[in-house]
């Protein structure tokens, strides 16, 4: 009888294990089908992001322009190499595929059939380095709606809005002592209002008034709008500290609650400067496709700076964020921002 009980127990355990395995396998199959249905590409193999060389197939007229851009990367680049026979662990990329010759297209199809990793050059650089090479962008990059799910998925937008409101209310509660102390210190140090409002360009190019703690003298822009510099003489002593720790941004939590801003997104800029920057930076206004953020990928990935080159780099991270937006990415950026606030690593 005891032996029978043991056998039954073993049988039950086996069936449970088999059931769990089957369920897991069934779930994975459903996930694969879902990914295929949604048009999501399979993830690149690990070697794709560790390789020291890549192959680029593009129109001959674009070779020098691409070579110039890729010279800033520590990658050896081969252009339109048709002598390539061994495709094992080779990274094959293409650029402006609609303008490729028939021979180039056939080569890329054959390379795919033989197991090479083939993908658009900009997408490859984007995935590998964590920012978008805006100098190589064409309008077609933005026309794949599935790649920019934050723009087209209402469920994603509603979830983000719920998280924004919840986080902003919680942060206001937790930081209320800091907000009160900061307001007192600003008032004690210099004459003028504790808060100031400034027009910024938000989602869909609609302007709104952003609220911040005043960190500069009252007459800081008596001579007109100017870029803030690293050691700006207009910044007060209290202002220098709250800018370094980003405490000056805390009143923008009210902008988040009101719906002007999000907790995470590209930082809002003034229209005066946007008009200058869009003359130098491709697709600069695309950052306005989403709500501006209290913090963003650019702010936790790139040091503080106010030059044109700094603006270009921040735009690279902003475009990457918009394309790859997820709740997980927002959480990651937010946690990195907390480190900046606690240790003053930002400015």
Q: Over which residues does each language-model region extend?
A:
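A short, structured surface patch at a secondary-structure boundary
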Residues: 229-291, 333-337, 341
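Bateman (tandem CBS) regulatory domains
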Residues: 143-147, 166, 223, 232-237, ...
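Short, glycine-rich, amphipathic interfacial segments at transmembrane boundaries or analogous
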Residues: 125-126, 132-133, 196-234, 295-314
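A hydrophobic, helix-centered structural microdomain
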Residues: 26-30, 155-220, 255, 332-347
């Amino acid at each position: 009888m005891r032996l029978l009980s043991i056998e039954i127990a073993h049988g039950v355990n086996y069936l449970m294990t088999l059931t769990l395995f089957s369920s897991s396998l069934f779930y994975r199959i459903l996930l694969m089908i879902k990914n295929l249905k949604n048009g999501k590409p399979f993830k690149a193999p690990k070697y794709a992001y560790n390789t020291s060389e890549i192959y680029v197939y593009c129109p001959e007229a674009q070779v020098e322009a691409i070579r110039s851009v890729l010279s800033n990367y520590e990658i050896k680049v081969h252009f339109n190499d048709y002598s390539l026979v061994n495709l094992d662990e080779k990274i094959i990329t293409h650029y402006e595929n609609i303008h490729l010759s028939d021979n180039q297209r056939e080569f890329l199809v054959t390379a795919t059939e033989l197991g090479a990793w083939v993908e658009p050059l900009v997408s490859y650089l984007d995935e590998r380095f964590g920012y978008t090479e805006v100098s190589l962008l064409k309008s077609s990059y933005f026309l794949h709606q599935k790649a920019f799910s934050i723009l087209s998925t209402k469920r994603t937008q509603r979830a983000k809005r719920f998280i924004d409101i919840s986080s902003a209310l919680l942060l206001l509660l937790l930081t209320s002592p800091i907000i009160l102390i900061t307001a007192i210190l600003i008032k004690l140090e210099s004459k003028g209002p504790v808060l100031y409002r400034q027009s910024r360009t938000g989602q869909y190019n609609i302007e709104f008034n952003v609220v911040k703690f005043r960190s500069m003298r009252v007459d800081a822009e008596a001579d007109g709008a100017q870029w803030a510099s690293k050691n700006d003489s207009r910044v007060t002593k209290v202002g220098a500290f709250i800018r370094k720790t980003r405490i000056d941004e805390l009143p923008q939590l009210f902008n988040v609650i009101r719906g002007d801003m999000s907790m995470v997104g590209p930082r809002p800029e003034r229209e005066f400067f946007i008009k200058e920057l869009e003359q130098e930076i491709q697709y600069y206004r695309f950052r306005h496709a989403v709500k501006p953020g209290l913090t963003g990928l650019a702010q936790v990935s790139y040091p503080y700076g106010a030059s044109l080159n700094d603006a270009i780099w921040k735009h690279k991270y902003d475009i990457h964020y918009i394309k790859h937006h997820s709740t997980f990415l927002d959480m990651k950026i937010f946690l990195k921002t907390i480190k900046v606030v606690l240790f003053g690593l930002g400015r």
